[in-house]
Amino acid sequence: MTSSSRGYQRVDSSGDGGSLLMEEEGDNPHEALLHRNNDDYASTYHHVGVEYDSYEELERHEMDDRVTEIPEGFHRRQRRNLIYGDDVATDEELRVLRREALFGEEVTRAGLGRAEYYEDSHLIHSCDKSGHEDIDDESDDESKDEDEEEEETGIRKFAKLVLPHVALVLLTCTYTVIGALIFYSVEQPHEQMMKEQQLKLIYTRQNEFVDDLIRLAAGNETKRYEWESLAERHMHNMSDQLFVAFEKYFLTSNEVKKNAATETWTFSSSIFFAVTVVTTIGYGNPVPVTNIGRIWCILFSLLGIPLTLVTIADLGKFLSEHLVWLYGNYLKLKYLILSRHRKERREHVCEHCHSHGMGHDMNIEEKRIPAFLVLAILIVYTAFGGVLMSKLEPWSFFTSFYWSFITMTTVGFGDLMPRRDGYMYIILLYIILGLAITTMCIDLVGVQYIRKIHYFGRKIQDARSALAVVGGKVVLVSELYANLMQKRARNMSREAFIVENLYVSKHIIPFIPTDIRCIRYIDQTADAATISTSSSAIDMQSCRFCHSRYSLNRAFK
């Protein structure tokens, strides 16, 4: 060690244990750059002006590029590991550096430099720790915000799914109530006035009849035909007046007896009338009799009927989807209960389809609710209406069942009408739900039959354009059938008919041998076709997926 040039060689961590390297030229030491390794901390001094190694720079730049490509979550975990890891310098290392400073100026500089480095690094890590704690708090806040956003998005999705249906129902109800209010405000005053006029006319006719009877009695009239003619004339006038009052102004016998008019156009009856209009039931009692009321009825129906039909169809679709869901769960439960007998009832699958992952348990058909089940639901609901109306109205069960069926099918003859206003809203709820159930039945059963009708129609259309080979010529089946019918019309004799049948059976109907099921197909192996007649029999099966036929050897028991 000399005064002109002194140096401490740094040994690598894999060598003698990591010494300090200090290089000086003269009395002016150069600035040092401290680098932190994964295993230990060391200080390395470089001469000013000396360039870094190109390989180290390249590696550093590559690492920088790779770090930028790492996701943010990985950076967060890495920073947490650095914060709570064992990389921070301990107090024992600081004491060792202070002891090394007692052995010389150079060692003191090196030791103090290293101690300052560790103190600075400890301060930096403490700052980083506090900073990362803030980052963790921010990340927790961000996660909470994300959870809240997910909840909000879930609520929004649910709202988007439910709100249109709820809004449609509320719109229909609001529209019906507004229409009922207008009907009530227009028809109720006019109805009260007209009923009072009709009662006055009825009692006027009655008083006239009594006056004529008194006049005949005062004149000592004893001829019978005079009394009969007088009574007949007044009775006809009275019956005409009563019929008009009942038919046109819905006057009842109790009102005539008490000589007091009661309100037919109450608010409940107005809502009931509005519902019967928009649902196209139309009982016909009561009806608007004023011009303003009739004009409003037309305008109200133009928008109310489509709106109500759409709403009822939406409710029916909702019920049909839930009924299909319940029926599917019923089938699953039935499948689980009867799973031990599944092998006996399962359909056959050929080896080719089985090799492609198609098995016996694969469900390739949509769940279709049987028609009798839907019809049973409709009948049960109608019977429930019969029981309900027999309790609410003075009707028998059969009369109530008849009214319920007429209402559910929107026929609405009007011969039976609920009269009790106290139960009007219960009856309205029953009617609306019944119309939704009727729509559900049409949606579940009617669509299936419509599909079948279209299927047969397409098949018939395809059959018309089918080709047949007759006498070496290709002709349409429709043309062949027309020619045969013309020939049959010309040859009505039995002999010609027999010859024609023989011709048809010979040239049109292909020959089908009786043992066709025993004939081996071209793609069937010889081993599968070899069957012992003494111990087994041939059972031709059809594949569930590709519909190809193949034979199974089934031994006699």
Curated annotation (Swiss-Prot):
Coiled coil: none annotated. It holds the Pfam family Ion_trans_2. The chain crosses the membrane at residues 166-186, 295-315, 369-389, 426-446. One of its GO terms (molecular function) is potassium ion leak channel activity. Residues 134-151 have a biased composition (Acidic residues). It is a multi-pass membrane protein. Keywords: Glycoprotein, Ion channel, Ion transport, Membrane, Potassium, Potassium channel, Potassium transport, Transmembrane, Transmembrane helix, Transport. It is found in: Membrane. Residues 270-290, 397-417 dip into the membrane without crossing it. One of its GO terms (cellular component) is plasma membrane. InterPro entries: 2pore_dom_K_chnl, 2pore_dom_K_chnl_TASK, K_chnl_dom. Residues 1-34, 128-151 are annotated as: Disordered. One of its GO terms (biological process) is potassium ion transmembrane transport. Belongs to the two pore domain potassium channel (TC 1.A.1.8) family. This is TWiK family of potassium channels protein 7. It comes from Caenorhabditis elegans.
